């Protein structure tokens, strides 16, 4: 792929523009008044939003889509002719942006090669934007979206008007991206396909490191190598020493490269730069006293639940102090942050049943989310975990870990595996995972499809239940159907 990105007015065409990562980039480019087009086989509210700001969206993927900003040719034309499609020459060829999910058989991808279009991975575009700004890039196996969104919100509330690119939708800016008018950029930096190594921000954050994405990585050591390369490119590195792997990486960065490093921890005895005491996690939020190099800064209040979100907030505190904010400004921004969508998101309440949507799909994330749910649950209230496994490779790799992740749930409802495009090799199934979980947790029910999940829950949810829909697939599509059906004899709070 061509790594050179032209922000000088040359068009961008995104293959699969409706994806959460692709659409955020397209939004920022379109808001910068650059020509943007894209295709997606499943138009959604995100593609409609892009259309509203001037992007042209195709609902089919075909070669002729690439000529939208060139001369108009028929979509039925068989022969691709660069001179006919782009009479002003190759300088008008669009820059074609794709993600790892796009394979070489894609018609638009093949046409881009034949026409000689510059082909960019989405990480190339993000890396170029990171280089264009005073940038903060948030990396880590878990907590990237919440941490980057929180930092973005904090800077926004402090009047710094940042550009923000994250992997989830945030109500504060009604989407997964916003274009600011200041030199600041906050971005979520994804490690799933190894492209994290392309980013060289002024401030880099590593929240934690674990093995994940077994479709790309075989060992934890391979994951660490990617984060080490990312760390080398950061002018200043911030990380949590509560993760042993991050702690070692920070130590190496500080000693071998004399790189400025800033550390944070939930434990005051770690000698981290930012620590907390007096932690109080309650159903309505989390508070703690924040310390900076042994000096008390003040009390931090979060609307978000649990210790892992307090850790994310400490990363935000470190960034705020680094860019010159007073603690009062930092605390105000963090206190107002309500979280990102699909991150312990309240979706409704009907007949006393509370519905929560969460993106958790890794064993560690499930444990943390269910622990937060148990904290919020009232005495006697059931925590019902409805989980859709994500990818065959992840389910097989972490089979043992998944079986131990549901201890805080009173009832587990498991669906079949959401493939996310992976082939089913017959090595693992949702039913096998259910059987494995049942060895540790007796209250497990297997319901393979969204329709059977809905049927089961409508019959078995009780008033007072806290129902959590967990997974990175399409399980959350069942929530509106269940709420709507329950609403027929009652009134829901939405």
From Swiss-Prot:
One MF term in GO for this entry? Answer: UDP-N-acetylmuramate-L-alanine ligase activity
Q: Where would you find the membrane-spanning parts of this chain?
A: none
Tell me which family the UniProt entry assigns to this protein: Belongs to the MurCDEF family.
Pathway(s) where this gene product acts: Cell wall biogenesis; peptidoglycan biosynthesis
Gene Ontology process terms (BP): cell division; cell wall organization; peptidoglycan biosynthetic process; regulation of cell shape
Q: Which residues bind ATP?
A: 140-146
Q: Which reaction(s) does the protein catalyse, per the Swiss-Prot or TrEMBL entry? A: UDP-N-acetyl-alpha-D-muramate + L-alanine + ATP = UDP-N-acetyl-alpha-D-muramoyl-L-alanine + ADP + phosphate + H(+)
Instruction: Tell me which EC number(s) this protein carries.
Output: 6.3.2.8
Q: Tell me the protein's name.
A: UDP-N-acetylmuramate--L-alanine ligase
**First-level EC class:** ligase
Q: Where in the cell is it found?
A: Cytoplasm
Q: What does this protein do?
A: Cell wall formation.
Gene name per UniProt: murC
What span is annotated as the signal peptide, if there is one? none
State the organism named in the record. Trichormus variabilis (strain ATCC 29413 / PCC 7937)
Which keywords describe this protein according to UniProt? ATP-binding, Cell cycle, Cell division, Cell shape, Cell wall biogenesis/degradation, Cytoplasm, Ligase, Nucleotide-binding, Peptidoglycan synthesis
Among HAMAP family, the record links this protein to: MurC
Q: Which InterPro entries match?
A: Mur-like_cat_sf, Mur_ligase_C, Mur_ligase_C_dom_sf, Mur_ligase_cen, Mur_ligase_N, MurCDEF_pg_biosynth, UDP-N-AcMur_Ala_ligase_MurC
Got a GO cellular component term for this one? cytoplasm
